[in-house]
Amino acid sequence: MALTSEQRAEIEAQRSEPQLTSRPTVAAMENLLFTPFEVLDHGFLRVVDYMGDDGAVVQAARVSYGRGTKKVSEDAGLIRYLMRHRHSTPFEMCEIKFHVKLPVFVARQWIRHRMASVNEYSARYSILDREFYLPAMDQVAAQSSSNRQGRSDALDADTAHQVLEILRRDASQCYDDYESLLNPEGRGLARELARINLTLNTYTQWYWKIDLHNLMHFLALRADPHAQYEIRVYAEKMIEILKAWVPATAAAFEEYRLGAFTLSAGMLKVVRRRLAGETVTQENSGLTKREWSEMAAVLDGAS
């Protein structure tokens, strides 16, 4: 992970000057505030601010003036109810802001989640660093034959080395050309034009602020095993932060979203028929092959 000297100085300054506040704070979050967590080869993720806690969710749900009940178990029970019944607005009362360094191709997946505020490092005004994402050997994988947007098994070592060399060579050459285009003693091309030649594995940075409800939606999709590895590792780190920030909400989220599976009306009929002792197959279930395999993977542990 490469932090600039300016970023390190900023982090140290922020951590050395605690702020007085009357608002609720979370001790675990205060301890990790501003701390960069390494992700991928040059990326990082750090919390720069947050608002609210589990108590804020409860307070909003009850529209109360206090901080919830005196019994943590009652507050946790209400949060579980809200999560189970897919209430959203109480969770929207909490917000968190991240500083993220990530490859451009990951950023383009990430930005599809539109319910957030984002401000990205501008290559129109500044020059991007010579930093590129190169996957680890075990992540250099073949295209999946069953999933058009997924990968399969890792390639053999020799092929993986060749792939990595191509990625490294192309990224380096494009950055050399980027510098050459920018050189005021040479072509002196505008930054907003010179950047278009850079590869998608170039690292960018942004500040990303989102409410708790939409954060959990993001995590449910991007921490899923089917999500691309390079964005999933960011989501997994964010789940660790979620547990420190709102532990009761995080527990309910894991119970009712991450570790859960939604049955369609047709799937529920199949379950009831099986409970009644009927032998149900995909052919007589009324489900498509994909629906059947997804349900079987959950109910029977089959693929």
Curated annotation (Swiss-Prot):
PROSITE patterns: THYX (PS51331). DUMP binds at Q109, W110, I111, R112, E120, Y121, S122, A123, R124, R195, R222. A motif (ThyX motif) lies at residues 112-122. Residues 43-256 form the ThyX domain. Belongs to the thymidylate synthase ThyX family. Catalyzes the reductive methylation of 2'-deoxyuridine-5'-monophosphate (dUMP) to 2'-deoxythymidine-5'-monophosphate (dTMP) while utilizing 5,10-methylenetetrahydrofolate (mTHF) as the methyl donor, and NADPH and FADH(2) as the reductant. Homotetramer. This is Flavin-dependent thymidylate synthase. It comes from Gluconobacter oxydans (strain 621H). The gene is thyX.
